[in-house]
């Protein structure tokens, strides 16, 4: 029965201790202000934490510390704790402590904590006796309360007259009476502030000036109907991307037919009749001369007259032009090629005509304004129309040659006939001014020409080159006429005994003597039994053994394309 009563008494004391621990000033450690004290300092009657309880045991004299949850308390101890506590201990042991003058140590450093506790309990630096503790506490409370009220309360507002006296002059802050109400003034201030940010209308104006009327630029802002309504426009931008102004330049007045401002864009401009237009047949290849294999010897005198008239029209048109077109030479070439040239009697390509040369010579343009970078092309016109002395195979008369391929006379040599001093070389084997024919000198080599009966000819003659065993030219008469595929003249062979294999003609010679209508292939040479063929004689007309001298090699041409 006594044990149960004692147990009930201990439970009652523990409950009272827990209630004291729940008080506001006992919720923190008295020495370090840590929350949740777990020990009780029975020497002074304060609630402390676990770390501070160990430090208090190391003081001299040591403090008696008890755990709140693991020990039992007597009735006297509970009453002592009720009379004391952290609030009363603060008034006694920290009665003279000033927070402004005394520094609170860092409680994370154990050495500083120990020094602070020694100053507090052993030296009693801030100790106040219990009988005076309440008085000192009340005084500190009054001092702290008055200072707090003086700093927190606003001083009483006194009139200025009481400070300056009755003799102080009256102070007028605003002499003028406001003409507008404050509401109106505030609205104007807002309008002026809004006007400062209106950067599009009044960017450079005075921000305090009266609002100016809205300018036309602001009125038409983002109005695309007035986009091109400016009074004055730049003349350079007026014709921007206007290709009508392209035709105003004098340099492009001929090529492509760019019109002037009065013409519609990109329409060919006419400089006269349709036949006299410079660019009428430009790049029109239907008027180009046909292949020479199809129209051998078909040129006539009327075509040369037509060519002369066309060239004269070209010269007449070019005389009226003030500037030189850089493509005028090509246009003249087209007119020259479109009209065929020929002679009375054609001998191969060396056709001679009796057309007047004066009109052809007058082709070069007059008063060219600037140097043309295609001057070489411009000279082709004069090259094609220049006169060359040629010997006709039938008439032996010297005429002004208007041949397109520029036949030049061939000088007499030891291989040619003494009677024919100048032989028209059909393919231009001698140096020529024709840009389409390159000159090639005869090379001395063993000939394997299928049209040659003598294998020991002196020269491997090229086309149109007279030799001892090669026809001197197409349609050229000779005293020794042998049956060949080209019906040409053969010179007296140096070795008549070896000319045992005559060649058969595929087609007979044309009676009019105007060339050859078709090329015939020679038949294979039949070698009789028991005889050895001559060296170098080939029966295949396409398999020649000596490639030298078969085609023109050297060139003295002025053609820029070769």
UniProtKB/Swiss-Prot annotation:
Gene that encodes the chain: AGFG1
Zinc finger annotations (C4-type) as residue ranges: 29-52
Localisation: Nucleus; Cytoplasmic vesicle
SUPFAM superfamilies referenced in this protein's UniProt entry, alphabetically: ArfGap/RecO-like zinc finger
Listed GO CC annotations: cytoplasm; cytoplasmic vesicle; nucleus
Quaternary structure and partners: Interacts with EPS15R and EPS15. Interacts with FCHO1.
Domain of life: Eukaryota
Modified residues (Phosphoserine): 167, 181, 362
Entry-linked InterPro entries: Arf-GAP_FG-repeat_protein, ARFGAP/RecO, ArfGAP_dom, ArfGAP_dom_sf
Domain commentary: Contains FG repeats.
Chain intervals for the UniProt region annotation (Disordered): 168-194
Sugar-modified residues: 367
One function term, GO molecular function aspect: DNA binding
Residue span, Arf-GAP domain: 11-135
Keywords: Cytoplasmic vesicle, Developmental protein, Differentiation, DNA-binding, Glycoprotein, Metal-binding, Nucleus, Phosphoprotein, Repeat, Spermatogenesis, Transport, Zinc, Zinc-finger
GO terms for biological process, alphabetical: acrosome assembly; intermediate filament organization; spermatid nucleus differentiation
Protein's name according to its UniProt entry: Arf-GAP domain and FG repeat-containing protein 1
Maturation and modification: O-glycosylated.
Location of Phosphothreonine modifications: 177
Protein task: Required for vesicle docking or fusion during acrosome biogenesis. May play a role in RNA trafficking or localization.
Biased composition (Polar residues): 176-191
Matching PANTHER family: ARF-GAP DOMAIN AND FG REPEAT-CONTAINING PROTEIN 1, DRONGO, ISOFORM F
């Amino acid at each position: 029965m006594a044990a149960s009563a004692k147990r009930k008494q201990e439970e009652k004391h523990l409950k009272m201790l827990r209630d004291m621990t729940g008080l506001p000033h006992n919720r923190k450690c008295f020495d370090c202000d840590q929350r949740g004290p777990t020990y009780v300092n029975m020497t002074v009657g304060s609630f402390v934490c676990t770390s501070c309880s160990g430090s208090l045991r190391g003081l001299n004299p040591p403090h008696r510390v008890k755990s709140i949850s693991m020990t039992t308390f007597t009735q006297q101890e509970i009453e002592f704790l009720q009379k004391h506590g952290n609030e009363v201990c603060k008034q006694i042991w920290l009665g003279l402590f000033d927070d402004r003058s005394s520094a609170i140590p860092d409680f994370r450093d154990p050495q500083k904590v120990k020094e602070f506790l020694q100053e507090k309990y052993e030296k009693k630096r801030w100790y106040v006796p219990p009988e005076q503790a309440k008085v000192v506490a009340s005084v500190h409370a009054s001092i702290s309360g008055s200072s707090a009220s003086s700093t927190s309360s606003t001083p009483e507002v006194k009139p200025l007259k009481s400070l300056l006296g009755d003799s102080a002059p009256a102070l007028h802050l605003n002499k003028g009476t406001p003409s507008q109400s404050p509401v109106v003034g505030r609205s104007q201030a807002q309008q002026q502030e809004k006007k400062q940010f209106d950067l599009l209308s009044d960017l450079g104006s005075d921000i305090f000036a009266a609002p100016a009327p809205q300018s036309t630029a602001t009125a038409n802002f983002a109005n695309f109907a007035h986009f091109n309504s400016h009074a004055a426009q730049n003349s350079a931008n007026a014709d921007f991307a206007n290709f009508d102004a392209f035709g105003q330049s004098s340099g492009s007045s001929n090529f492509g037919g760019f019109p002037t401002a009065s013409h519609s864009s990109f329409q060919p401009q006419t400089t006269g009749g349709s036949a006299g237009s410079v660019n009428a047949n430009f790049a029109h290849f239907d008027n180009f001369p046909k292949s020479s294999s199809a129209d051998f010897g078909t040129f006539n005198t009327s075509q040369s007259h037509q060519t002369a008239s066309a060239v004269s029209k070209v010269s007449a048109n070019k005389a009226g032009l003030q500037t030189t077109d850089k493509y005028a030479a090509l246009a003249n070439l087209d007119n020259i090629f479109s009209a065929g040239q020929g002679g009375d009697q054609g001998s191969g390509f060396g056709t001679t005509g009796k057309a007047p040369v004066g009109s052809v010579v007058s082709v070069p343009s007059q008063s060219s304004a600037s140097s043309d970078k295609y001057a070489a092309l411009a000279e082709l016109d004069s090259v094609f129309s220049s006169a060359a002395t040629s010997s006709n195979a039938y008439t032996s008369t010297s005429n002004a040659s208007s041949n397109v391929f520029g036949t030049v006379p061939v000088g007499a040599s030891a291989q040619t006939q003494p009677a024919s001093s100048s032989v028209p070389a059909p393919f231009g084997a001698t140096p020529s001014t024709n840009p389409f024919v390159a000159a090639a000198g005869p090379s001395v080599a063993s000939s394997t020409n299928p049209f040659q009966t003598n294998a020991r000819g002196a020269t491997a003659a090229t086309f149109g080159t007279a030799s001892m065993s090669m026809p001197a030219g197409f349609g050229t008469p000779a005293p020794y006429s042998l049956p060949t595929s080209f019906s040409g003249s053969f010179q007296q062979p140096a070795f008549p005994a070896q000319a045992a294999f005559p060649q058969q003609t595929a087609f007979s010679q044309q009676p009019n003597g105007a060339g050859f209508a078709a090329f015939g292939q020679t038949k294979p040479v039949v070698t009789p039994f028991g005889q050895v063929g001559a060296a170098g004689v080939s029966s295949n007309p396409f398999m020649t053994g000596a490639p030298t001298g078969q085609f023109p090699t050297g060139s003295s041409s002025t053609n820029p394309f070769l």
